[in-house]
Regions:
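N-terminal amphipathic alpha-helix/helix-capping segment at the start of soluble metabolic enzymes
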Residues: 1-24, 82
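Acidic (Asp/Glu)-rich catalytic clusters
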Residues: 15-19, 45-52, 85-90
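Short glycine- and Lys/Arg-enriched binding-loop motifs that mark or flank ligand-binding interfaces
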Residues: 23, 29, 67-70
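Glycine-rich beta-alpha loop segments
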Residues: 23, 40-51, 58
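Hydrophobic faces of well-ordered beta-strands that scaffold small-molecule active sites
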Residues: 23-27, 55-59, 95-97
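N-terminal active-site wall of soluble small-molecule enzyme domains
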Residues: 59-106
């Protein structure tokens, strides 16, 4: 009996599966600024290239699950989508983020 699933998940040009090389989903917890996002994406891209592993850049545009009402939540959907598109085109990385409500999928 095999414990390997017979499926794979592909995000952009990165495939995650038991029979594929190691790949990472990595990035800052919260999208704080364009400069910070580019600094992180650049550092992660350099590391993944150097190690020869796939990378999907992941960060959240809205941290809705804060324990403090005064906690930072992020840059919001519209501004973040522009930054995500720029990260994709500048670094050639697929970008992943959280979905909080059904409406955000439309």
């Amino acid at each position: 009996m095999s414990t390997k699933p017979d499926y794979a998940v592909t995000v952009g040009n990165v495939t995650f599966a038991n029979d594929k090389p190691l790949a990472l989903i990595a990035g800052p917890c919260q999208l704080e600024s364009r400069d910070h996002a580019f600094m992180m994406a650049g550092a992660l891209k350099e590391m993944s290239d150097r190690l020869g592993i796939g990378l999907v850049y992941k960060t959240s545009y809205d941290k809705a699950n804060r324990t403090s009402i005064g906690g930072k939540r992020g840059l919001g959907l519209e501004k973040s989508l522009e930054i995500f598109a720029d990260i994709r085109s500048t670094f050639g990385l697929p970008v992943l983020t959280d979905v909080h409500t059904e409406e955000q999928c439309r």
